[in-house]
Amino acid sequence: MCFDKIKYLYVLVLLCFCSCGQSYIEEITTEYAQFKINDKGYICQIINRENGKNYLPEDKPSPVLQLYDGEKYILPTRLKSEGNKWTITFENNSEAVVSKEVKSDSYVRLSLQSLTNRDSIQAIAWGPYSTTISQYIGETVGVVRDTVFAIGVQALNIFTTEGVPHLGDDATGAFYINPLPGQTVPDELKDQVGKKISDINVNEEGDMPEYVRQWRGNAAVERPYGSDIQFEARDWRKEKVIDYVGRRQTVTAYDQDFIGSAIALFAVPSSEAVDVIGKIELQEGLPHPLIDGEWIKTRANQNPAYMLYEGSSLDNALNYADSCNFHLVHIGDIFKSWGHFDLHTSRFPNGVEEIKAFTDKAKARGIKIGVHTLTMFTSTHDAYVSPVPSDSLAISGSSILTKEITDTDRDIEIESPEFFTYLGETRSAKIGTEIIGYREVTKEKPYKLIDCTRGQFGTKPSNHKSGEKIDKLLNNCYSGFFPNLELSNVYGQRLAEVCNETGIGLMDFDGYYGGSPTGHGCMGASMFLKQWFDKLDEKNMISCGSSPFHYWWHIYSFMNWGEPWYDNLRQSQVNYRLENQRYFERNLMPGMLGWFKLEQTYRPEDIEWIQARSAAFDAGYLLRVDESVEKNGLKSQLFEAIRSWQELRNSHLLTNSQREKMKDPKNEFHLEKTGSNSWNLYELTLQSNNVHKYRQVQTGEPLLSKFVFDNPYDNQPVQFYGMIKDGGDKTGKISHLKILINGSATIEIPAELKEGNKIYSDGKNIYVCDNNWYTLLKYPCTSSALWSKGKNQVSVQCDFSSPNAPVVDLEFKALGNKEQIAGK
């Protein structure tokens, strides 16, 4: 494969010497652009008709089409134009007939009609089409743009996919060290700037470094001169074995090749790019879903804040949604198993009828219901697996038994270990109707599967004869399996049936890295989606997921990813969330922040941290809510903050300056609703880690701790939070807590406090609370307790019941720089 890459780069260098000269065999004109093609088969200029600017790099013409034979790219040498078609001759004397048509005065439709001398040709490549544009490179949508002009390509069928053939057929991406202005790279990595690094699993690592950039696809790629836009189509009609994600994978034959591959090429003002894609969808029969009569890409509030509820009280789900003013509720997994997708579960014992009744009830309250599936993951207890496994389960490859086995033998001899050395999570193989698990494969002949578990997942252990076929099953990361290409289509149809029957409004296709495990790349992933979408009775479904690719761009409403709530809120995948906003912006996608969980310990400042980021990026998010929120004494304030912030966000009244400040996760804000369409916005300062604990002091010396709080705002009543934390003595207590402000005003808390208690001041009163902010005691706060502008001296003292009594951890709070926001 390294050799292939070298060949490919060499070809790109050669293109620099294919001078276009001054004459063109064809000049194609659309409303906004002119495409100039020479008699060698190269696009030499893409001109913005408004200002005459050429967006192709000088001396770098782009081939209309290339051929790929598995080792090298075969370039065009001549192009002949006849009416609505081109005949392109290549270096190997192959001739391609490409139809061309300007449609809606907006784009050029190109389609491969035929190819001669094609026996050795494995794939064709559209382009790559080189541009000088580098500001926004849409690796998924296939559009590059700056603030003025956009150039893009859309694949017009599912077997035309993003990328270039020598890099495979997935929407491959990568991580690079490439700091943005103001970001610092560690000294030991400074020589790696601009270079690719190993993939980062943010769920395992917790986050990604801020100086790392992630690219999620290859429909468009960054180049020194700007960018390339690139698409391909492959001949799938012959079975082959490839190296795929660390394993050997048999790619089964499928009756599809590159004849008929088609693209739409366009160049328009940047502000028109999304609209042109909409025209292409309608003209070419691509998915064009509407929600409430509006196209998903331009509808208002296309990326809402919404809720996940996985509890059993579905009435609570609707009530919590009303409390947040959310109109979309994700209720999680509703399936008995993945595969057959049976709907009879403990939450919905009566299946379809019960789910439909609930979605109707929600709809009457203005709420859509969404559900979750891991796309093509197949449960081990599904009927496709147990008790008789389907022959349509995906396999990586096969061998044969070289020795007869009984139903109790635990070592199994096989002819070849080729497909069995990649163990995966379940290490499973299928012999006839029995699934066996194995611990390892011996490295020398006779090759054996060692320590086998017979009759895995409820299948029946059996005797097997020498010469019987043994298949290595493909495992997913949930220890289940995958369907083959044909069965995946059945899955797509079944999930459409579920949508049609139940009235759900959102389908969350989680785990789409399982979309094409069979090696059929984006085509296989797109086949599943097309089956689902085509079989929907109504196309007004919201769909989302975590791994978008080009075809899915047309269908999906927004990107969704989850479970990053295991860490402290303000450290929970923050860089990853921000990096995704850059991805959305360059790919004409609505912003989303991912998942959060409404914890029973949250304060208003915590939920407002989420809301400020949502408003900054105009990004939705998913908020997981369950009955634990009932334990939160500040619950009503949390819900009020969510409602107010989302109302402000959707009003689009924030200035660019305000939004830029909010994009910095280190900045805190408070929003105060003052009317039906008016708010006060405050900047907020929180200073934490002011810890007062027991220590030895000299006789007569007071046991106190001194802190300095720098208030950047005007004078104001003292506000703070305090957490009483473990000091080692679980039965220990503190009492007579006093907080002295600037040597004059004393705040006294006469209550006895223990580990888990919390205290706070809102400037008017002092509240003693349990661990979840439920008020136990309330005391008035002295009116003389004020934060002065600038540095404030704070002294804290109390009585400790023992040297290991609890400690007091204080967080000082101030707000200011009020800005009034009002709509009409």
Where are these regions (language model features)?
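Bacterial Sec-dependent signal peptides at the C-terminal "C-region" and cleavage site
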Residues: F17-I25
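Carbohydrate-recognition beta-sandwich/jelly-roll modules
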Residues: E27-V329, K361, K368-I369, G505-L506, ...
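Glycine-rich, aromatic-flanked loop segments that form ligand/cofactor-binding clefts
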Residues: P269-P289, D322-H330, E354-G397, S466, ...
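Aromatic-lined carbohydrate-binding/catalytic grooves of carbohydrate-active enzymes
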Residues: E294-S398, L474-E497, T502-S526
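Carbohydrate-binding surfaces of carbohydrate-active enzymes
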Residues: I355-V371, F377-S379, S392-S399, R613, ...
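Autoprocessing Asn-cyclization modules and mimics
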Residues: T375-P461
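Glycan-recognition surfaces
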Residues: T380, Y384-S398, L473-V490, F533-G633
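Intrinsically disordered, low-complexity segments enriched in serine, threonine, and glycine
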Residues: R454-S462, S466, F709-K824
